[in-house]
UniProtKB/Swiss-Prot annotation:
Source organism per UniProt: Mesorhizobium japonicum (strain LMG 29417 / CECT 9101 / MAFF 303099) (Mesorhizobium loti (strain MAFF 303099))
GO molecular function, one term: acyltransferase activity
Pfam family, one: NodA
Location of the protein in the cell: Cytoplasm
Domain of life of the native organism: Bacteria
UniProt function note: N-acyltransferase required for nodulation. Acts in the production of a small, heat-stable compound (Nod) that stimulates mitosis in various plant protoplasts.
Keyword Amino-acid biosynthesis included in the entry's annotation: no
CC annotations in GO: cytosol
UniProt keywords, alphabetically: Acyltransferase, Cytoplasm, Nodulation, Transferase
Residue stretches in coiled coil: none
Keyword Iron-sulfur attributed: no
Enzyme class: transferase
Protein's name in the database: Nodulation protein A
């Protein structure tokens, strides 16, 4: 049975403290099973991990936050080409709803991407999530690119780490919005020029 989820589209400035606290708890519970540090970054009411989203789609059911997807418009560099994208990140589905088809409802974001007029949306995920994100590709909304490295800055300054990191083991998800996929630049390195969303 598909859960009854109501979707809320909100700009970051519209969120109030109770919203951040509820989202922080949601992210801790959603991300902790993938590693203790992954959940720890959401302590203290923090509802973002790296870059802060400008727009969020939040799904609610009778138990609270059921799903979330964040969006941030930014310029990235693909190979030698600067490219405006809407980065998608902070994706999560409450663990008790995994496998119930709620991920398909995240397509609520697609009309928003069209309204924003960006040429592409992009995000990166661990290879373990290939089957999960491939659901978006079945409808023809997205493409998965492998063999692409993504360079990002750390969200904070760490004295024992360089200021940037390169993820060699990620899948890049690209959604053609205002352009066709054939117009996505060739390149094996994407430079975020900032922290991951």
């Amino acid at each position: 049975m598909r859960p009854d989820v109501q979707w809320r589209l909100c700009w970051e400035n519209e969120l109030q403290l109770p919203d951040h606290l509820e989202l922080s708890e949601f992210f801790r519970k959603t991300y902790e099973p993938t590693g203790a540090f992954n959940g720890k970054q959401f302590e203290g009411g923090r509802s973002w991990a790296g870059a802060r989203p400008e727009l969020r789609v939040i799904g609610y059911d009778v138990h609270g936050v059921a799903a979330h997807l964040g969006l941030l418009r930014r310029y990235i560099k693909v190979g030698d080409v600067d490219l405006l994208v809407a980065e998608l990140g902070l994706y999560g589905v409450r663990p008790d709803l995994e496998g119930l088809g709620i991920a398909h409802s995240i397509s609520v974001m697609y009309p928003v991407l069209q309204q924003l007029g960006v040429p592409f949306a992009f995000g990166s995920v661990r290879p373990a999530l290939r089957n999960h994100v491939s659901r978006f590709c079945r409808k023809g909304l997205a493409n998965i690119l492998s063999g692409v490295r993504v360079r990002s800055t750390h969200p904070d300054v760490y004295l024992d780490l360089p200021p940037t990191r390169v993820d060699d083991n990620v899948l890049v998800l690209v959604l053609p919005i205002g352009r066709s996929m054939s117009e996505w630049p060739a390149g094996t390195l994407i430079d975020r020029n900032g922290p991951e969303l």
